[in-house]
Amino acid sequence: MLFLSDLDRTLMDSNGTITEEDVNSIYQWTQKHSFGFVTGRDHAFCMELASKYQFSCEYMITDNGANAYYKDQNVYSSLIDLDDGIQMCKEILKYNLDLFYTDEVGNRYYPVSSYGKERLHSFEKKQPSLGRFSNIDILEYINSRDLGLAKLSMYVENDLDLLLNQFRDLFKNYEVMATSKDYIEITKKGTNKWEAFCHLPVEDAIFIGDGENDLCILKNLKNTYVMDHAPESLKVYGVCVKSVAQAIDIESRKENV
């Protein structure tokens, strides 16, 4: 049986830390079963996290469903066209927002040509969990790519709901979503975690999540858990728990009945 977990505010706190209780539960689970991540985070971040905690993590859905991996092999991609990506970046820059793109190995690209290096350094200090950024400008980098883009990310300090609606009107042919209280991300139309799941070599799984972008999986899988801090609208789609460890414990007890 496969157990899939969302990362931010489900398995991992805002500092990127996983509790000892959750870590030990995952170790016990993976002695007999499979485990994986389902997240808006990029693949490089997920690989580093799995390595840090020494998780056996064969399945990964990353970038809000833009990519799916099985045993480190990319089995599915849903990517933004490069020309469209460049045009969207130019529109977003008019709003003076902190925009960035993360490549396949975890390098991040910022509008350094438009905003300057001082603003980049200020942003790095403001969001240290993102790590270091390249000195190459985001538009210059996208112009040099051959593959499409998994997602565009924006850090939004104020007026998130207002900006979310404006970008949804502006980019009607793309998925525009708030992935946290201060982030808006854009992916290709039709991209979601459930669509990515359907391309993994597995028919069923247990899933735990806490966000609106988890709803597509919560609605489609039978065996689901929702974190107790999740919006009330999500709680009807799974068993409410306080931690990943609690969900794994419930599943383990089912096996022993």
Model-identified regions with their sequence ranges:
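Active-site phosphate-binding/coordination module
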Residues: 18-117
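Short hydrophobic/aromatic-enriched beta-strand-loop microsegments
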Residues: 57-63, 120-121, 175-178, 224-228
